Amino acid sequence: MTCMGLVREPGAPAPYQQIQRILREEILAGKSAGDRIAPERELAKRFGANRATVSRAIGWLVKEGLLIRRVGRGTFVSGGGEGPARARTSTVGLVMPYISGVFPSRIIRSAVRSLKERRYKTVLFDSEDSVMAEADELERLAQGGLDGALIMPVEKPDNISLFAGLLRFGLPLVFLDRKPLGLEGDLVGSDNFRGAYDATSRLIERGHRRIAHFTWLVERTCTSIEQRRRGYEQALIDHGIEVDPELMCPPASFPDESLYFKYTLAYLRRDDRPVTAVFCLHDQFVLRTIDAASALGLRIPDDIEVAGYFDESFHPLDDVAVLKVIQGQDQIGELAAGLLISRIEGGGPDGYQEITVVPEIVDPLSGSR
């Protein structure tokens, strides 16, 4: 095995801490319960360290509950009830991709309030919408000291193996709003399919047949994005309208993002069957679409109608007639906290749960909600 040298510069973590971190990352990313790890002498050779240093690193991983030592047999990945019981701390992690803005802040307040009522403390982690920062925060969760975590993941799948590792090793997790595609786990969020379906159906009922969907298709992908796309598509199908992939458009890389929306909207309006409505993934796309329509001399809603998901019913766009799908952040935070507590205390339902909150439709053209 290739020797992996440790950093020995001033200010670097102690050698055992570096080994501990490397092994922790490898366990979470690719090991299963019962897998045997390499003997200490092999690890010492690999890291260029003495066996006492390796033994100390492994000892800490045993304390974290990731490993279990079996006399005469070796050291194995724990799981499935093996290893020492996790000490209860009545402390819960709250991992968010960002903490500013109405949507995350209301979920945070609601979750913290519900947890506090049950005498749980919270530790807030802000990944700043970075998959690397999120990976660091997930590693901190694995180090122990927490009973569980509420997680709103970054809208990219890079850390799915780390999430799976935490679940595999028994840390209670509940995902907020979304989770990586293909990952099994508890989720509490908006009913994204229904919100997209209802909004698109309203546009169709007003006579629109060429409806674009401005969304992420490749770079960012998670359950909420996928469910909104499926809701949009199903509404078209149920109303006898063929789904046109050309009308589903992801943002592209331009020096000025608004140029993308302008050029895309101009392209979709170019022929004798122009797009007459747009359903947007979220309110930032709505803002860009309104700017693009203005730049092209299009009036809303006379020339083109715009709909999309919003974080709250009151918005700077209130002077523009936009159909809004409003998410219930307070309910999401409260329900997620309740589900996490039930998992921690052992009284939760069998199997992973997906709890959805029905969004509110605010339609200025019909005067209805």
Task: Give the role of each language-model region.
Residues 1-48, 56-59, 86, 109:
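Extreme N-terminal segment that seeds HTH/winged-HTH DNA-binding domains in transcriptional regulators
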Residues 210, 243-247, 300-304:
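Short acidic capping loops at alpha-helix termini that bridge into adjacent secondary structure
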